[in-house]
A protein has these predicted regions:
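AAA+ P-loop NTPase catalytic core and its hallmark functional loops
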Residues: 1-247, 252, 264, 269, ...
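Conserved C-terminal helix/linker of AAA+ ATPases
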Residues: 254-255, 269-286
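N-terminal accessory nucleic-acid engagement/regulatory domains that precede
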Residues: 255, 259-263
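Interdomain linker/hinge connecting the two RecA-like lobes of the SF2 helicase core
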Residues: 286-298
């Protein structure tokens, strides 16, 4: 049954005379291109917005669901609040919670509205990402507010919170299909919840539209080699959708990869280097050679002989130099040049943690290298462990009196100061931690993108992302299936191969000597 507010909207629904034109999005940066299909979806969603009908965007990762809403809000000057749901999201995360008064405060506690309450009461657009990861109790709480037109929630240590729904409030949700292999964490939304939304499908982008998108991205980046751009789009489509072997490893490839590739070559990167890095770095052995063979035989100009990989730079940490390590550095260096974050993967015992530490150290500006750190992620890791929390100021007894101060976590220090660090075993992070990272790791196309919200920090909830910020993570190959495609596609994934494969006895002894000397 459709909620009362939606029923009223449907009764009064009249399609506004709205037609989005190219000039409306001329200042939108990034990978959004106004194809005919994108235009139809934008017009449809805008019409639902005008009638205040909740919208559910449904489709695979990387089909521009989020970007579509960002474009609409930008064009029509609507404030947008994004929130990623997870299996650990609770009602307090959405409605709000009581926090200590903050630094030097003697007022014990205060209520800080959550994203749902803020958007609901102020008439903003609320975008709920990955809504089918949310708990039923959280979804039911939102259902009640949509039904009644008000929030009436009991908040521990504070009392009843009440808020009326603003007439301009708009709610949008996204969901990705379960078939993407994200270890069954996606649930089925109830019919009762679904009935409140009008579904807009975002299908897989077909080859003709993909070519238009690639050409549009090239034009935005003033890259005029149409033949190369077409080859990139055709290869992207063939590799992801037409190759039969190991399709599970192709999870995570999206339009972001086309955007990153074209942007890199427009900034001077050789097309072969960009394509092999952004599409091939996660593979090894047979799969990697298969990718190279496709490029060599079908896409002239995108192939490169990787037997000619250069040596490690002279200022790289002292180590046993080998083909696997040189190849990993080669990919990491290209990715870093184009502001891509790094996920180093490999078999257990392959040295991914040590190599990630070396890369993190090398890519950190020299004056900041002493601040590098290793953060070992576990199933018990919390968002507060990563970003920070309020702690008693000075004496622990001050907590009960409200005298507290915010202490940044390692990730916040990295974000603000441009340090680099390694987040080891990232696949062990709880879903709530992973979902909190997605917006942080998004490509940065505008000045506004360089700000990140840390709602737990009521003293400084908005942090500027330093230009030197680099997120380096590790994961074992056997654990990659635990990471969502939405998370994977924010990284250049680099597969560290066996560093002693094919080594001579002399080379093995050299490797052992380096291990002993490094402690």
């Amino acid at each position: 049954m459709i909620s009362s507010i939606t029923k009223e909207n449907l009764i009064n629904f009249k399609r506004p005379k709205f037609e989005l034109k190219i000039r409306d999005i001329k200042d939108i940066k990034g990978d959004f291109v106004l194809t005919e299909e994108a235009k139809k979806r934008l017009q449809k969603i805008k019409n639902f917005f005008d009638s205040r009908i909740p919208v559910l965007l449904e489709g695979p990762t990387g089909t521009s669901k989020t970007k579509t809403i960002q474009v609409l809000c930008h064009v029509f000057k609507k404030k947008l609040i994004r929130f990623h749901l997870s299996s650990e999201t609770n009602i307090g995360d959405l409605i709000g919670r009581v926090v200590s008064g903050g630094e030097d405060s003697w007022s014990s506690f205060r209520f800080v509205p959550g994203p749902f309450t803020e958007a609901f009461s102020k008439g903003y657009v609320l975008l709920l990402e990955e809504v089918n990861l949310g708990q039923n109790s959280v979804l039911q709480c939102m259902e009640t507010s949509l039904d009644t037109g008000e929030i009436n929630q009991d908040v521990p240590r504070y009392g009843i919170i009440k808020a009326k729904m603003h007439p301009d409030f708009i709610i949008v949700a996204t969901q990705n299909p379960k078939i993407e292999g994200f270890t069954n964490q996606r649930g089925e939304l109830s019919q009762k919840f679904l009935s409140r939304f009008t579904v807009v499908e975002f299908p897989t982008v077909e080859i003709d539209e993909l070519r238009i998108i690639a050409k549009g991205i090239a034009e935005k980046n003033n890259y005029k080699m149409d033949d190369i751009v077409r080859k990139i789009s055709d290869f992207h489509y063939q590799w992801i959708y037409k190759e039969e072997d190991s399709k599970s490893t192709k999870r995570g490839f999206t339009l972001r990869d086309i955007n990153a590739t074209i942007k890199a070559i427009s900034n001077g990167e050789a097309p072969s280097d960009a394509v092999i890095c952004f599409y091939g770095s996660r593979y090894k052995g047979k799969e990697f050679n298969h990718l190279l063979e496709i490029l060599k035989t079908k896409y002239e100009g995108l192939y490169k002989n990787l037997n000619l990989i250069p040596k490690l730079p002279y200022d790289f940490p002292k180590c046993y130099s080998n083909y696997s390590l040189k190849k990993t550095f080669y990919f990491a260096n290209i990715a870093k040049r184009h502001d891509r974050h790094l996920l180093i993967v490999g078999k257990e015992g392959s040295g991914v943690t040590q190599v990630a530490k070396w890369l993190s150290w090398y890519f950190t500006p020299e004056k900041k290298r002493k601040e590098n750190f290793l953060f070992i992620v576990s199933p018990e890791t919390t968002v507060s462990d990563m970003f920070g929390k309020f702690t008693p100021k000075g004496d622990a007894s001050n907590f009960s009196s409200g005298i507290t101060e915010w202490r940044n976590g390692p990730l916040t220090l990295t974000i603000k100061n441009g340090y680099s660090g390694v987040f080891d075993n990232i696949s062990y992070a709880p879903a709530k931690v992973i979902e909190s990272l997605n917006a942080l790791l998004d490509p940065k196309d505008t000045e506004e993108d360089y700000y990140f919200e840390i709602p737990q920090n009521t003293v400084e909830p908005r942090v500027k992302i330093h230009k030197d910020f680099l997120f380096v993570a590790t994961c074992s190959l056997s654990q990659m299936e635990k990471l969502s495609p939405a998370f994977l596609n924010r990284f250049t994934v680099i597969n560290l191969e066996d560093q002693l494969e094919g080594a001579t006895e002399k080379e093995e002894k050299e490797a052992i000597r380096h291990i002993i000397e490094s402690g």
